[in-house]
Amino acid sequence: MKREHKLEHEDMSSGSGKSGVCWEDDGGGMDELLAVVGYKVKSSDMAEVAQKLEQLEQAMMGNNFHDHDESTIAQHLSNDTVHYNPSDISNWLQTMLSNFDPQPNNPSVNSDDNDLNAIPGKAIYAADEFTSRKRVKRNESVTVTTESTTTRPIMVVETQEKGIRLVHSLMACAEAVEQNNLKMAEALVKQIGYLAVSQEGAMRKVATYFAEGLARRIYGVFPQHSVSDSLQIHFYETCPNLKFAHFTANQAILEAFQGKSSVHVIDFSINQGMQWPALMQALALRPGGPPAFRLTGIGPPASDNSDHLQQVGWRLAQFAQTIHVQFEYRGFVANSLADLDASMLELRSPETESVAVNSVFELHKLNARPGALEKVFSVIRQIRPEIVTVVEQEANHNGPAFLDRFTESLHYYSTLFDSLEGSSVEPQDKAMSEVYLGKQICNVVACEGTDRVERHETLNQWRNRFNSAGFSPVHLGSNAFKQASMLLALFAGGDGYKVEENDGCLMLGWHTRPLIATSAWKLAAANSVVVSH
């Protein structure tokens, strides 16, 4: 815990088989990089191969999508005119992975080409050198022909086939990483870069971020886990995920505060405070007038050492003043929620003030440190809130096996990138949202130990954790379901988004894949005894 800020205002706010087509070798020395994806090429020929791959990459106009400069990314996306059913990528990926057998073939660093797991493909390469005259046609497939005075073979590189090989290469690289076969993993991650340039839209971007995560893990260059507020704001504007999270949590809190004259929200994830103006507005419209509203906002230190929590408080206070809500605010800077202690929160008796605890995309980070989540559960029990609202990603990225985590995250983030492609938003917002998600991908793939904080778990896993910690579920009513559905109807490009009720919880999904889940909890009867402070 580093510091706190307090602000009060009386009236204020806020294949497995080898490919049948290969380049023959007349003398040993196969190159591992191409052999691993089904081709036999002599090391002495690699200069020619590299030249041809570079020519092919240029012909396909592939761009490595990972420039964090906003104007560059926005310009790139504004020129991307690919249109498709946005559900196709994730469904196609599901099919590809279901046909992929990740069982190890016992590769080792010293394996020869016969030990490598070949990835099936049907790209046919001309045996002779490229001539200077070529024709390239961009369509569902790319056809390149060479012209000369003699008849030459035709090189056909189908985008779909390269997409299949891309997915298989990603999986094979992850398997090599899990087996600590870094030589093969390095070869594969380079091949992924070549294959990604042939893809369009979401698949290229997803593959690029996963390739970055794999490369960082292989070479030991680990990313810093720091997501700027500006990236999150772009994500908020681009897709309904955070809007859904805030709306459903606020609805549960509003119902829990019904008839209360003084209320206190403890927000474990204050960020820019974007969640709370809507709740204060709803409280202001309550029959009989609004209650006194106290907000405690908890957040990490700012990367620029600015007093950002105080700034959030002032903005909320100004809003509260315009709607005539009595407002009090305190901000706590904490490196981890596990640093919290109930005595810091200036809790008042339940007879005079009702408390709600809110956490949006925060609790999963505690899984990185043994005992941290249990410590926070203990603090919540001491707070004795009327309700605890929790929003988390609906994914399991916290398993012990790297390959399982990689596969699950590839499915999950492919769906998220699909949803971004399907939205009608400003290119800059979409580009920055992709960077926001890309940072998560790199953390899931590249990091381990306490550095791996994106340890998402499913709703069922969180149910087990809360039940074991002495909490019982609070069902989110049909009213919240209907209003959340209306929210999506108002969101541009929201046709692919779905709201589902799951045993009293609400899930937001893209087509058939759930993305996030909102749940609400209260102390079980046995844990409702009064604790003096």
Swiss-Prot record:
Chain span(s) of sequence motif LxCxE motif: 171-175
Region of interest called Disordered, as start-end residue ranges on this chain: 1-24
VHIID, as annotated region: 232-297
Organism, as annotated: Medicago truncatula
Compartment list: Nucleus
Gene: DELLA2
Start and end residues of each stretch annotated as SAW: 446-522
Record's note on what induces expression: Accumulates upon phosphate (Pi) deprivation. Expressed during arbuscular mycorrhizal (AM) symbiosis with AM fungi (e.g. Glomus versiforme).
Region (Leucine repeat II (LRII)): 311-343
Protein name: DELLA protein 2
Motif VHIID, residue range(s) on this chain: 263-267
Residue stretches of biased makeup (Basic and acidic residues): 1-12
InterPro entries noted in UniProt: DELLA_N_sf (IPR038088), TF_DELLA_N (IPR021914), TF_GRAS (IPR005202)
Domain remark text: The DELLA motif is required for its GA-induced degradation.
Family designation: Belongs to the GRAS family. DELLA subfamily.
Positions of the UniProt region annotated as Leucine repeat I (LRI): 164-218
